[in-house]
C-alpha cells in the first residue's frame, strides 16, 4: 500500500463518529478535538463525493498514516455551511452562491476546487398546475431551502420577471421536504434541486422555468484552519477528487448507478442527472468563470438582507478562492482499494 509522507498536526480536528451521520442544524454539538480524523462530506448533489466514498480511496490512501476518514452527509448547501462553520466538517460541498454567502457573513472558508457545473435548479410545479408562467407565481406559496442555489435561483427568477421575493410566500424547507410539500399540495411550486428534482419530474412534476445562467457551480470548500494546519491532507482530498473526475469520465453509467443507490433513484433518473444535467469534467481550478457568476449573485444577497452590505460581498469575492490545491491536483497519489 502506498504511504504518503506528511507531518500531521491535526490539532482542533473533530472526533469521528461510528457511523455516517447526516448533517443537521445540530452538527458539531459533540465535536471534540481529535488528532487523527478527516471530516469530509458527501452529498447527492455532488456525484464526485459519492464516487470517492464508494471506492474507499481516502481510507486506503490515509490508512498507513493513521488518519480515520469520517463521512458526513450534507442534505443541502446550507447544511454543509453549518458543518463548516461549526468545524464539524473540514471539507464540504456547496453551491457557489452558498459559499459566497457564508464567506461574506464571516465563515472562515476557502473554495479549493470545483466539483461540477450543473443545471441542478429549476422552478417545479405539480402535474396539472394552473401555473403556466413565472408571473403566475405572484401570491403563491413556494417551497425553497434558504441559503442554497435553488433559493437564489428563485430570487433571480422573480427579479427577472419584475417581482421580488416579497411577492411570494416562501416555505423554508429542506430540499426533500420541499418536494414532499409540492407532492401533497402544501405549496404551489418548489425551487427544486437534482437529483430529487429529476425524480419528481419522473413522477409527473413539471420544470416550469429553467435558466442555466441562474445555476452557480459546485464549490468544494474547506475551513481556513484546516488548510493552514493540514495543507498536505487537504491536497490528498483534492487529489481524490481529481481521480473521481477521471473515473466518472470513463465510467458514466457506473457513476449514475452509485448516485441511484445513494439517492434511492431509479437508474434512468440518475442517468438523466449525470448525463444531461451535470458537467463533472469542469476545470477544477476556481477562477474568473466562477467569480463572474458570483459577482452577479452578490448584490442580490444585500438586496434581500442576507448580507449587510456590498463591501462584505466584495471582500468575500477577493478572499474566497484558493486555487493552489486544484492547480496541483495529482490523481496518481491516490491508492485504489484492493
Question: Language-model segments: what does each one mean?
Answer:
Residues 299-338:
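Conserved C-terminal helix/tail region of periplasmic/extracytoplasmic solute-binding proteins
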Residues 97, 170-171, 176-263:
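Pocket-lining segment of extracytoplasmic ligand-binding domains
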Residues 27-29:
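Bacterial signal peptide processing site
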Residues 49, 117-123, 205-206, 216-220, ...:
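Small-molecule pocket liners
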